[in-house]
Regions:
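NTP-dependent small-molecule kinase module
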Residues: 2-8, 12, 164-172, 179, ...
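Conserved phosphate-donor/acceptor-positioning beta-strand/loop module used by diverse small-molecule
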Residues: 113-120, 135-168
Length: 225
């Protein structure tokens, strides 16, 4: 995909003045693991990290706001964005679609770090863009790409714990619960190919680990300037 200056979005790891662009942190997790809570905590503390707000066709949940939690759009608008190649990645999750727009991440003037809160399918597609890898079964696919996305997986402490969390969330029958648990099982198997894995058995402890990853990656990036 080309921009008005004829530069591929996929090639924009460097700003036009030659300085490294901001880092991309891609955080994913099974449903009910606390990913959104941890990401919100991070954004509250690190004001210089920009959140990439995803587009979705699902309905708003209580407390969510359009343009802040997600861009809530209908299926027709989502189809249009796919047709016009406006997404870096999009995925169908439990019958609802989620997508990350190119303009949210590959703005040529962006120097700030960006936080992507996306599912495992989304990370797979992001990896394909940056590393030409077909899927997460191909680790180290960004080995020669200094400015690749930093992938972080939030894991539940156990299968049983995740089951209890999803039951407490409510709003789903036993068939939906089993579907989410089976999906979580497959997602957790792919977590070994992420850069980092954080087990969320204690929210404050998990947040300290997430924050430490951000700080460490920023220091690593400074060495390349």
């Amino acid at each position: 995909m080309m921009d008005e200056k004829g530069i591929k979005f996929e090639d924009k790891e460097l700003h036009l003045d030659g300085k490294p662009k901001g880092l991309i942190f891609a955080v994913s997790a099974p449903s009910g693991t606390g990913k959104t809570t941890l990401c919100n905590m991070l954004l509250q503390e690190f004001k210089d990290i920009k959140s990439s707000i995803s587009f979705t066709t699902r309905a708003k949940r209580p407390g969510e706001e359009n343009g802040i939690s997600y861009h809530f759009i209908n299926d027709s608008e989502f189809d249009r964005m796919i047709k016009e190649d406006e997404f870096i990645e999009w995925a169908n999750v439990f019958g609802k679609r989620y997508g990350t727009a190119y303009k949210s991440v590959f703005n040529p003037d962006r120097l700030s770090d960006v936080l992507l809160e996306i599912d495992v399918q989304g990370v797979e597609k992001l990896i394909e863009i940056y590393g030409n890898a077909k899927n997460l079964n191909k680790p180290n696919c960004f080995e020669n790409n200094a400015n690749r996305p930093v992938t972080i997986f939030i894991a539940p402490p156990s299968y049983e714990d995740l089951c209890e969390r999803l039951k407490k969330r409510g709003g789903m029958d036993s068939a939906e619960l089993n579907k989410r648990l089976n999906t979580a099982y497959e997602e957790i198997k792919k977590s070994v190919f992420y850069d980092y894995i954080i087990t969320n058995d204690d929210l404050s402890g998990a947040y300290v680990k997430l924050k430490s990853i951000i700080i460490a990656e920023r220091c690593k990036n400074l060495q390349k300037i």
